[in-house]
Curated annotation (Swiss-Prot):
Assembly description: F-type ATPases have 2 components, CF(1) - the catalytic core - and CF(0) - the membrane proton channel. CF(1) has five subunits: alpha(3), beta(3), gamma(1), delta(1), epsilon(1). CF(0) has three main subunits: a, b and c.
One of the protein's GO biological processes: proton motive force-driven mitochondrial ATP synthesis
Protein name: ATP synthase subunit epsilon, mitochondrial
Localization: Mitochondrion; Mitochondrion inner membrane
Source species: Ipomoea batatas (Sweet potato)
Recorded GO MF terms: proton-transporting ATP synthase activity, rotational mechanism
One Gene Ontology cellular component: mitochondrial inner membrane
Pfam name, any one: ATP-synt_Eps
Length: 70
């Protein structure tokens, strides 16, 4: 069994790597000066579509856009 000394600090803090990397990315974006900050924040948007399945068949897809803000 591995010792606790080898555990990454993000895991020791109770975070997943995705949570840790998102936190770091937000800090870097907030350190940027304008107009670079606005450009970086505009790339943070996410667009995706999803379909609910009923009786083994997909329903009409819904399109969703998230800004990345919680």
């Amino acid at each position: 069994m591995a010792s606790n000394a080898a555990v990454p600090f993000w895991r020791a803090a109770g975070m997943t790597y995705i949570t840790y990397s998102n936190l770091c990315a937000n800090m870097v974006r907030n350190c940027l000066k304008e107009p670079y900050r606005a450009e970086a924040l505009s790339r943070e948007k996410v667009h995706f579509s999803f379909s609910k399945w009923v009786d083994g068949k997909p329903q009409k897809p819904a399109i969703r856009s998230d800004t990345g803000e919680e």
